Amino acid sequence: MSEHHPEKRYEGKAKILYSTADSDVLLTYFKDDATAFNAQKKGTIQGKGEMNCTIAAALLQWLETQGIPTHFIEQTKADEMLVKAVKILPVEVVVRNIAAGSLCKQTGLAQGTVLPQPLVEFYLKDDNLGDPLLTRDRLMLLQIVTAEQLAQLQDYALRINGLMQGFFARCQITLVDFKIEFGTDKTGTILLADEISPDTCRLWDQTETDPNLRVMDKDRFRQDLGNIENAYQTVQARVLAQVQQLQSLA
């Protein structure tokens, strides 16, 4: 990668950001690396980078058409995309529609419990602290975001959830929950950043009733369920088919 991307700006668990000739544009390379439990578990999922990049590009581009401002510019290779340079807000926004994962552990809710309304949560983006759950008052205390920005994040999160629930339902996939990140561009405008993929969403196959077979996301890696590549491939195929169908109707 170095001969093509001479200046690495940032490397995370799943992606690498490189500078481009335009200071307002970055190139994102999606890796095949897989991590779970705050990088305590590590592995490789063959082809994950290409699949996540393609899925994220399709979803971000579609969300743009629905009025959600994102950092996405274009997909340049199977595992690379150009994005607008943003300053990432140090908060992860999680939206939950069905109880799963940490929500079950922390509340005692049974996995699969349908929530009466979407639950929006905010986590501090800090690996050293274990990405702790934050109350709104703690967010204000830490001065991570302004009250106005917090209201915007909440609004965007719920709008994105409603849009993606409908989109995935047409793919015969249930959107259980998902994590998103936001950043601000040089004008201070908040943009949806990072990615939306099986790495950042819990997705259950509506055509499967078995609780293990229906899992189509990184829980297959977390829980050693196997067939990870096949699950990601299925998500990619259904997402691209749905995008193509929507484009044909436009």
Curated annotation (Swiss-Prot):
Its EC top class is: ligase
Q: Known NCBIfam families for this protein?
A: purC
The record ties this protein, via InterPro entries, to: SAICAR_synt/ADE2_N, SAICAR_synt_PurC, SAICAR_synth, SAICAR_synthetase, SAICAR_synthetase_CS
One of its Pfam families is SAICAR_synt
Among the GO biological process terms of this entry, one is: 'de novo' IMP biosynthetic process
Reactions catalysed according to its record:
5-amino-1-(5-phospho-D-ribosyl)imidazole-4-carboxylate + L-aspartate + ATP = (2S)-2-[5-amino-1-(5-phospho-beta-D-ribosyl)imidazole-4-carboxamido]succinate + ADP + phosphate + 2 H(+)
Enzyme Commission (EC) number: 6.3.2.6
Taxonomic classification: Bacteria, Bacillati, Cyanobacteriota, Cyanophyceae, Oscillatoriophycideae
Q: In which pathway does it act?
A: Purine metabolism; IMP biosynthesis via de novo pathway; 5-amino-1-(5-phospho-D-ribosyl)imidazole-4-carboxamide from 5-amino-1-(5-phospho-D-ribosyl)imidazole-4-carboxylate: step 1/2
Please report the name of this protein according to its UniProt entry.
Answer: Phosphoribosylaminoimidazole-succinocarboxamide synthase
Question: So what family is this one in?
Answer: Belongs to the SAICAR synthetase family.
Q: Provide the alphabetized UniProt keywords.
A: ATP-binding, Ligase, Nucleotide-binding, Purine biosynthesis
GO function terms (MF aspect) = ATP binding; phosphoribosylaminoimidazolesuccinocarboxamide synthase activity
